[in-house]
Structure formats: C-alpha cells, structure tokens
Regions:
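Conserved catalytic-core motifs of GNAT/GCN5-like acyltransferases
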Residues: 94
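PIN-domain endoribonuclease scaffold, especially VapC-family toxins
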Residues: 1-84, 98, 102, 106-110
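Nucleic acid-binding interface residues in structured DNA/RNA-binding domains
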Residues: 90
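Short glycine/serine/threonine/alanine-rich loop segments
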Residues: 87
Length: 113
C-alpha cells in the first residue's frame, strides 16, 4: 500500500509499535533491517511528539471523552500528530473516524490527485 505513496509521515509512537511488534515476533532482526531501510528513504519522515502534539492530544482525548467514545492512548497520539500537521491518516482502524476534524482514508488512492 505504501509503495506508491509519494510522501510518508509517521510518528515515534507508530515507530515504537512497529519495534515492539518486531520484538514479539520471530524475525526481529530482519524486520528491523527492513524498517531501517524504509526510514532512510527520502520519502519518509519521522515526526517527533511536541508540546503542540500534547495540546492536540488533550483536545482529542477530551472530545472523545465527552462523546463517550474512547480510543487507545497510542491512537490518541497518532491522531494528534496528524491533526497537528494537517495530514490525512491512512488506516484501517475505524475508531479514528470518531476524532473530530481528522481526515481518515482507507486507501492510498484516496490521497493521490
């Protein structure tokens, strides 16, 4: 799915989830090597969490709390990062659609002109 994306942004929370998954699997070294190659691509940028991300996190958390629709805390950080950067979120996790103002897409084709 990402092979054809002109630009890919991921935050450090997603990176942590990937590395954790690798550690729990049977191909950690190979997966880490593939990840390293992926991160070295000029198409890929790693977004750090900032004070602005934390502010966005608080707003997302509060909005979902008021609606009685909580989502996992890592996903709050992911949504907050996308909102902070004005980026669409490519995901199959439908609970992201509960986040006000977040553009969620399920197919890369929905992001391409």
């Amino acid at each position: 799915m990402l092979r054809h994306a002109p630009r890919i942004h991921l935050n450090t929370v997603v990176l942590g989830e990937l590395i954790g998954g690798f550690a729990a699997g049977t191909r950690e070294a190979a997966n880490r090597q593939s990840l390293s190659k992926f991160l070295d691509s000029p198409r890929v940028s790693l977004l750090d969490l900032t004070v602005d991300t934390a502010d966005a996190y608080a707003q997302v958390w509060l909005g979902l709390r008021r609606k009685g629709q909580p989502i996992p805390s890592n996903d709050l950080w992911i949504a907050a990062t996308a909102l902070e950067h004005g980026a669409a979120l490519l995901t199959l996790d439908s609970h992201f659609r509960q986040v006000d103002g977040l553009r969620v897409v399920e197919r890369l084709a929905d992001l391409l002109p």
